[in-house]
Amino acid sequence: MTEPYYQSSNLYLKYSMPQSKYFKLSEEVVDILVAKTQSQNRHFFRLLVAYYFSKVASMMRTNIDTRDRGVIPVNTYVLNLMPSGAGKGFSTNIMEEDVIEGFRLRFLQHILPHYSNLQIIKLASNRQTIDPTLDSTQANDLVQKEYDALGTLAFSFDSGTAPAVKQMRQKLLMANAGSMNLELDEVGSNLTANVEMLNTFLELYDVGKVKQKLTKNTKENTRGEELMGKTPTNMMLFGTPTKLLDGSRVEEEFKQMLETGYARRMLFGFESTISTGKSQTAEELYNALTCTNVDTNIKRIEKLISNLADINKFNTVLTLSKDDTIHLLKYKIMCEKASEDLKAHEDTKKAELAHRYYKALKLAGAYAFVEGSKTITRIHLDSAIQLCEDSGEHFNRVICKEGAYARLARYIAEIGKEVTQVDLIEELPFYKGSESQKKDLLKLAVAWGYKNNIIIRRTYVDDIEFLSGESLKETDINKLQVAYSNDITEGFELNTTDFGQLHKLTGAKDMHYTAHTFIGNYRSGDKAIPGFDLLILDIDGGCSLN
């Protein structure tokens, strides 16, 4: 295989290969999601598939035996942001109901009962060792009672508390099977209510360990035995970008989460527009939505995923060869070197970039497991790295999103009418706070607009402030407007040219030219049409070109 080429930039590491190499099975599922939803946002679907592949692998307690970090679990954290109507809910339902439903049933009905019974017997035996007065039946009943008291294992959940997460973790440790899978929809609306739980997930990412909280032991609330072990966790946060990155407290909390450690743990997807591809007729759309090949592929992939719920595949420990480990370490070194090139204040970007290789390793493990491989190959690594690189670009879209002042300036310029403070408060969720805070935000918007071709004007009527704005169109030097004629006053027709060709006009003999156009093509000040994109300096010899 051709050695990959690495090239660093100030924002993200560009990892390129001879051709784009996404994981084959993942792309097959993505093709199905594209066909079913008619949405062309493939990166969103790739992350969605990556999450569910990792979920399947971690439920089966798949681990990676690395040569440098020891044994680590396969798991993935994902943040996927797309506008409403882009197919988030539809594609998620397809994954749950058509792709992994067979696996879910087989796992809950066969794998979980089998391994939980074995673990309960083992724990009961340990209890007997500690307390010889217990017979095997008594010890087994005690452990079974504790296990049942922890409730039914949740295959996935959409919210919770830190104590509930730790209780679920205790259930997983006693079962010695399964993983915790948080799937939080409308993350912008639900982030603040789940901060405590998300902080716990922060600790669980690397190896699936978290310290228990010290609680008072009472007769009614007995502190249970702390079991040592690892419990893999997966997380998928999805919603709309405008709700999460709203310039208010929610966005501040989210940015703090990234700084705290989620930047290095998550794969990112950020799309501000819906891509639907080429337009179709109603009949073409019907044929695409009812294509039998798509349904056939879904059934084939569902069966493949369902067969992964096999006792022989449980607790798979994936390995890497020396060459493939070196291949990954090369990527790790390049990630770290590229992160060192970032500015000192870009801590969040540094963390995301420096740990990108680790996310790729975990994802490669998921790819290897669903393919039925016992080893992580270079193909798995390159596929995972490709997606992590895409994630890095989307992460920078998230972290470099325009500030509230820029959005305020654009709103005033694009609304097309005068607005008052009342309009701003009603229309813009980020335009909040005290009068002085809003005044400062508006001041920043005016300053930002000044450097970004936006003019904001203020007028006052009866002490009421009216704001209006306009955007100056950026000049395209390949389409400059110029009028010229071989007559000094007549025949000045409008033409467009690029800047590189202007010297032919200015050097032509007996040719007159202007930056303006004129009514009736007649050159006269009173007939000039307002607007120009070319500035002509008439210098008669008082300035040296040198």
Feature-to-residue mapping (PLM):
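Signature for HUH/AEP ssDNA processing cores
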Residues: 476-546
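Phosphate-handling catalytic cores of nucleic-acid transaction enzymes
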Residues: 1-475
